[in-house]
């Protein structure tokens, strides 16, 4: 489900007139107290859109008929955009302000974009998130991304991260720099020599790499030597 809504549907043979949706950590309701009544159209369509949900949260929805639970389902909402970040709408806006970047940066990407010519993240950046907007993953080309200072996290979400040449996604190569965390979630990664190549970055042994819900294609196919794979 998206970050803030979910569609709950049930079989045509099941009668439902109310529902309760709550975090899965909450106890199972004893009755229909506080339940939301379905509209005539929702009853006829055997489906309802549940609004006002929190991102990255597991919920259980209980379907009721005549005051009794008749069905239930558990789901987890998708991630939501981080708060407290300076947001740039598109890679072009980010590049235009590149030398002034600092603090927490959120880049919202809704169309295919090329960032391969801007590989050195400015030293004043603390966290940077590349956020793919929409149901279809926008393509983002990056090349040997690194940081000029100490950065807490580089994150990619809902993107098709594609190589244009014989590169890695992230390849720190600056003395005195460090990366604490790299997160790649709900992305497609394709045609890279490797994902992370460690070279001269300090503290490389403590770097945490988290790849979750991703498709990886043709990893290492561009490599002509031994340093290719997830991490080199």
PLM regions: where:
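Beta-strand-rich modules
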Residues: 50-71
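Detector for repetitive beta-architecture
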Residues: 104-106, 112, 127, 153, ...
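Acidic Gly/Asp/Thr-rich repetitive segments characteristic of extracellular carbohydrate-active
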Residues: 79-120
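Glycine- and acidic/polar-rich repeat regions and solenoidal domains
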Residues: 10, 164-176, 190-211, 217-232
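Feature marks extracellular polysaccharide-active and adherence modules
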Residues: 110, 131-133, 157, 162, ...
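Recognizes extended acidic, P/S/T-rich segments that occur
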Residues: 20-54
């Amino acid at each position: 489900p998206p970050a803030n809504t979910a569609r709950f549907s049930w079989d045509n043979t099941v009668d439902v007139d109310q529902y309760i949706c709550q975090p899965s950590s909450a106890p199972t309701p004893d009755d229909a107290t506080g339940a939301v009544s379905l509209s005539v159209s929702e009853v006829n369509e055997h489906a309802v859109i549940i609004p006002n949900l929190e991102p990255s949260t597991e919920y259980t929805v209980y379907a009721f008929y005549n005051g009794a639970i008749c069905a239930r389902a558990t789901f987890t909402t998708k991630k939501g955009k981080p708060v407290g970040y300076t947001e740039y709408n598109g890679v072009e806006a980010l590049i235009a302000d590149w030398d002034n970047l600092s603090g927490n940066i959120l880049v919202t990407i809704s169309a295919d974009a090329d960032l391969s010519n801007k590989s050195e993240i400015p030293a004043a950046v603390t966290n940077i998130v590349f956020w793919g907007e929409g149901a279809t993953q926008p393509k983002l080309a990056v090349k040997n991304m690194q940081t000029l200072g100490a950065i807490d996290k580089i994150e990619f979400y809902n993107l098709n991260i594609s190589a244009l040449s014989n590169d890695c996604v992230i390849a720190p190569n600056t003395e005195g720099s460090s990366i604490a965390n790299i997160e790649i979630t709900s992305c497609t990664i394709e045609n890279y020599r490797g994902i992370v190549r460690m070279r001269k970055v300090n503290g490389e042994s403590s770097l945490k790499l988290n790849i979750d819900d991703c498709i990886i294609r043709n990893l290492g196919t561009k490599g002509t030597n031994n340093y290719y794979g997830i991490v080199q």
